[in-house]
Amino acid sequence: MALAISDDHKELAAVAAAHLMRQNARTVARDTLDAAANTSALWASTAELGWLGLHVPEEFGGSGFGLPELTVVLEALGHELAPVPFLPTVTAAAVLAHAAPDELRSAFLPGLTDGSLIGAVGIAPGLRLDSSGVLTGESRAVLGAPDARVLVLVAGDDVVVLDSDLAGVTVTAHRGLDTTRSIGTVAASDAAVPANRVLRGAADVAVALYRILTAAEAAGSASACLETALEYVKTREQFGRPVGTFQAVKHHLANMLIGIELAVAATWDAARSADLDRVGFAAAVAAANATRAQVETARLNIQLHGGIGFTWEHDAHLYLRRADTVAALLSDGRQPLVDVVAAHRAGQAHGASLQLPPEAAEFREQARAAVQHLATLPESERRDYLVDSGYLVPHWRKPWGREAGAIEQLVIEEEFQGVEVPELGIAGWVTLTLSQVGSEEQKMRWIDPVLRGKNSWCQLFSEPGAGSDAAAVRTSATRVDGGWRVNGQKVWTSAALGCQWGLATVRTDPGAPKHAGVTMMAIDLTSPNVEIRPLREITGDELFNEVFFDDVFVPDSDVVGAVGEGWKVARATLGNERISIGGGSGSIPFTGTGLVKLLDSAVDGHPGAEREVGEILAEEHTIRLLNMRQAVRAIIGAGPGPEANVTKLVKAEHSQRITNLGMTLAGTAAVTGLEPDVTYPYLFSRCLTIAGGTSEIMRNTISERILGLPRDPLVR
């Protein structure tokens, strides 16, 4: 299960999955298609495990944990489509535990916790409560209503807690698209609601809890679709090979994983919130991400299974039915994406903070002292102080950095907010590699001048016609006395004109296999017979360059690593590059805030634009959450997850999506020079899905290295 990071949560997820497998939950779910399935055994066994009360205080019969533990179990239930009223019951209990007085909590929470009471939750508008406590109207599509004894329903800004047999209240059951769900309409005709059954001002909290817990279940269903499709394409053969080797199939599966990771990160963040009264934005982001992922993975699961996925006997359509039902329930009356925009306008666009362990205090004291000392220095001395103290590159090994672990890095990031720290860019990726694989003499000669800003490096990997294939090296070197003669051409070299050195892949053994026979060399770009020609980009800038080598001499002392093992060095450099980009560099200045301003100032109407802006804002927030989950994994030693690979790809495409929409909202102002803050980032963002590995190649990497799909046998 994807939500769990800590060992305790992983163990809980494993127990939940094993229980549902033993109870044949998915088989019971299928039985609901043709007849009323017997779900009582599954419900009873689930209640016996105490999961219904994971989030309920101990004094009311619960375990006293919280939403993080509950969402782990809900993810497992969604994975197996468990046809029990777990979601509405725990949501009702969550609302009561947070917003109800002790009298109501004592009356209902013990029964909701042990499973003797079933709860229902309705968030759709339609119920009206007058000042005398008379309830009229209807709440349609109330989850769990036909089976429930306690109804928790939104009525305006309030929540009413009703017995299902209250005079004036009727429940009409519906046989819906998702037969594993019990859904009904609750109608009230002059129903008298006692004052102690009205939770004043609790509607927003009820909606937020409903969204968070439903998102967790949706993430589980989406993961099941990915797993099923992945297993199928690995074994299903067409045209003499597994269909999972085809790039189009790989990209579908990579997109499924990306959507799930966004949903998981957003749900994880919302569930961790300590202040449920301020969780509305995070809950809306979770709901938006999770429903989109659930619907898209369910649809793609059928597509990837081909004809078999369209059959009644296959489970794929059960997940499609669930996905579309969840999407409808979560958008009934209150669109999560619209709420995302509203929260952003109100300055409430925030999620849970990252809680660091006690040992962070010492690092914080040191970093704070460094910042204070830095402020006392003349500007000309500040860079040297950052280098000497290790705060310029704290994650590097000593003597250049501080060998800072995850906790110290996060503390430094927080304490240095607003402090101007020189950005090394590509030179940082290259010199970090030199610190890892260079000789001692090379490290002494090259690294310190870069850190102190005395010279800079570029990366000489890309060649004409090679595209994203960094191993397609044709630049060659022949052995001469004392070194090598290099001939060839590199292209798309960033900032080469301003660099003194370049780290180049050079083929030294033309008879060796593609990834062998390559040697890494440091080339002095001021050497004779090196020619650098700038390439003008669509923005008008000249960042990229062509670099030509005509019998350029490279001494043996400038060979980095062993001769013939340059690909290993290149992989290290590319890895450093991707970590840096995925960690947050390479962004554009145009953000969601600018998009909201354009939306609010647009003269012409843009139907549906508010939801589109909401999607961008939700994605922008979730990118930060992917990085946060990666940081938490590092802090607790949980090992790497897929977040780093996913973040680089999502961020690049996000930059294009946000500027695309910005151009649309700006209209003619964007093309007449009146909105340069939109137009320039729009043009620049075109390169972000190309540089550092194209989005298409990144999807191949995700599908092969993370999902385990086989490589295309035709690729050499």
Predicted feature locations:
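Amphipathic, small/basic residue-rich leader segments at the start of a protein or domain
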Residues: 1-86, 335-428, 432-435, 445, ...
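Glycine-rich phosphate/cofactor-binding loops in nucleotide/flavin-utilizing enzymes
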Residues: 2, 13, 72, 91, ...
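Glycine-rich beta->alpha junctions and the first turn(s) of the following alpha-helix
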Residues: 2-14, 78-79, 171-261, 356-358, ...
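C-terminal helix-coil-helix/basic helical segment that borders enzyme active sites and/or dimer interfaces
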Residues: 25-37, 230, 234, 238-241, ...
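N-terminal glycine-rich flavin-associated loop
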Residues: 84-102, 424-441, 467
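A short, Trp-centered hydrophobic/proline-enriched beta-strand micro-motif
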Residues: 114-125, 153, 453-461, 505
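A short core secondary-structure module
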Residues: 122, 138-170, 435, 487-533
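Extended, hydrophobic interaction surfaces within ordered domains
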Residues: 226, 239-348, 677
